[in-house]
UniProtKB/Swiss-Prot annotation:
A single Gene Ontology CC term: plasma membrane
Gene encoding the protein: aroP
Subcellular location: Cell inner membrane
Organism: Shigella flexneri
Pfam families, per database record: AA_permease
InterPro entries in the cross-refs: AA-permease/SLC12A_dom, Amino_acid_permease_CS
Chain's role: Permease that is involved in the active transport across the cytoplasmic membrane of all three aromatic amino acids, phenylalanine, tyrosine and tryptophan.
Periplasmic topological domain: 41-42, 108-117, 177-201, 262-271, 355-358, 421-425
Cytoplasmic side: 1-19, 64-86, 139-155, 223-240, 293-333, 380-399, 447-457
UniProt catalytic activity: L-phenylalanine(in) + H(+)(in) = L-phenylalanine(out) + H(+)(out); L-tryptophan(in) + H(+)(in) = L-tryptophan(out) + H(+)(out); L-tyrosine(in) + H(+)(in) = L-tyrosine(out) + H(+)(out)
Protein name (database record): Aromatic amino acid transport protein AroP
Broad class of the protein's primary localization: membrane
Amino acid sequence: MMEGQQHGEQLKRGLKNRHIQLIALGGAIGTGLFLGSASVIQSAGPGIILGYAIAGFIAFLIMRQLGEMVVEEPVAGSFSHFAYKYWGSFAGFASGWNYWVLYVLVAMAELTAVGKYIQFWYPEIPTWVSAAVFFVVINAINLTNVKVFGEMEFWFAIIKVIAVVAMIIFGGWLLFSGNGGPQASVSNLWDQGGFLPHGFTGLVMMMAIIMFSFGGLELVGITAAEADNPEQSIPKATNQVIYRILIFYIGSLAVLLSLMPWTRVTADTSPFVLIFHELGDTFVANALNIVVLTAALSVYNSCVYCNSRMLFGLAQQGNAPKALASVDKRGVPVNTILVSALVTALCVLINYLAPESAFGLLMALVVSALVINWAMISLAHMKFRRAKQEQGVVTRFPALLYPLGNWICLLFMAAVLVIMLMTPGMAISVYLIPVWLIVLGIGYLFKEKTAKAVKAH
């Protein structure tokens, strides 16, 4: 593709394989693990490890379903394109807009977390101030070009990977060398009331919050339109997700919960930072706080990228205003970045009005949108595969356990919604789902009416 052709309608293919790999990783290691895991530990105890394994398996199935579609048709807008093409125009419209809203909400949650991490050092700084500062900085960087985004995300993710691996190694050394003190023992995983101290119910009730940690893995699909070689980079990035889950989620939590009894974890501080702080290692606690701050900024950076590309894809499909389907001479969709930023700025207001409850509220809304998102990926994939089979096409990167895997994912989503209805503070976000679907329906009818009026003239 020539440079001159990219101005107006085409995104620039500026992401290398290493960028794709690390963007997937950036989506997987964020606030869900570093901050969200605190409330899960309080309810499920060491059983959180099993919870992450179950949710990780579901996330991997979803990733493979999306991966199969993206390898066959690498386009901007990712799965909303597949919902549109293989399911119907309303499905494409609804899934695209839901995905955009999902990542606006994730962006808000990450900015809120940034404020909490800054308060570890400066408790007097309100969360909304930190959110506002980083909001401006990250959006300004994303207005440059996709290579700058790719490089920034690459280094953000490198920092996270090195830090988590170092934390596992250092934690393991403290554990087995005796330098972690008398309380550091693998027996902490079952001694403090058992592996599941509140029974299996305690774990089940936390599955919605655990699911929050995995939102972002599907970013790989969004990068497809700007990947140099999607046929190779997408399968590679997708398959490596399972190892990341094992190492970064399960490995780090197993070490962490062995170093100190899970009962010492508090809900409003990163357990990663807290445990090393409690062990008296201030240097490591400060270093880890830098890492969790980097993690939140990394995911927010990915959100800015993702939101703008999804909105760009919607505009190309005719599901968003045409002005959003343009890029500047560098191949950057400036209009969609600015529109997404404008809505995300509400986060600053939410943190100003309700600093204590902002993160919990945003997390609940994210999970509801994520349930819709993952369910639509699974359903769109079933229709995609059926269409390909009828055409006699053998796909290059088939999903696992089709169609059983799809039904397992859909049942899991339904179970998460039921759990949320039973969880104080989360039920409201489930009640908002029908309202949101009605809003989408009205938006779709308005779009169709406008399109017909334009054709008539």
